[in-house]
Amino acid sequence: MELLKKIFLVLTLFISFETMSAQSIYDFSVLDAKEQTVSLSDYKGKVMLIVNTATRCGFTPQYKELEDLYEKYVDKGFEILDFPCNQFGQQAPGSVEEIKEFCSINFKVRFKLFEKVEVNGDNESPLFTFLKSKQGFQGFDPNHELGTLLDNMMKKADPDYASKSSIKWNFTKFLVDREGNVVKRFEPTDGANKIEEALKTLL
C-alpha cells in the first residue's frame, strides 16, 4: 500500500511538473485513438478546437455541429481534436474503437479522435490542466434549455462552482489560434454560431 502511495505521488508530481514547465500548447504530446503519441507541435500554424466529448450525453448531437464546422473550414487550416471523457455521468462508455464507430455511423465524423482522458482531478490530462489555466469557466447560457438545469445541479454540489476553472460537463471547448494561444473557452451550452464567429476571426 505504501508503494502505491509513492507511485501515485510521483505521477502527480510528474503531471504537475509537465504542466508548470509547459510554455506553449505545442509542448504537449497526447495519445491518439490508436495509442500513438502525437505532438501538438504537429498543429503549428493551425487553428484548433479542443473538446471533451461523450456519446451518451444530451449534448452528443453537437457532434454534427462540430463536423459541419470542420468540413466548412478544414481547408482553411482548422482542426478539431476530440478527447472522449467518461467523467460526467459515465456518458462515454465503451472503447475508443466503439466511440469512433458510433461517431462515424451517426454523425459522419472525420475530425481526429484521441484516446480517452480525464479532464479534472488527480489523473487529469496535463493538456487540460494547461487549457483550464488559460481560460476559466465562462458560465452556462441561461437561454439554453439545459443551462439553468446545469447551473442548479452544479450549485447544489458546490455553491462556489462558477469561480473555479474545472471542466463542468461534456463538450467544453477550447479555441487555439495559429500561434498556439488559447483564446476562447466555450461551455457546452454555447451554440455553434458563437464558436463560428470566433473561429472566423482566426482563419
Q: Predicted segment positions?
A:
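Non-catalytic, surface beta->alpha helical segment in thiol-disulfide oxidoreductase systems
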Residues: 183-203
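Conserved helix-turn-beta segment immediately C-terminal to the redox Cys motif
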Residues: 46-47, 55-56, 60-84, 103-107
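Thiol/selenol-based redox catalytic cores and closely related redox-interacting motifs
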Residues: 108-188
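Thiol-based oxidoreductase modules, predominantly thioredoxin-like and allied folds used
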Residues: 77-94, 110-121
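Short loop/turn microsegments at loop-to-beta-strand junctions
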Residues: 25-26, 48, 170-172
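N-terminal "domain-start" segment that seeds a small globular fold
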Residues: 20-41, 61
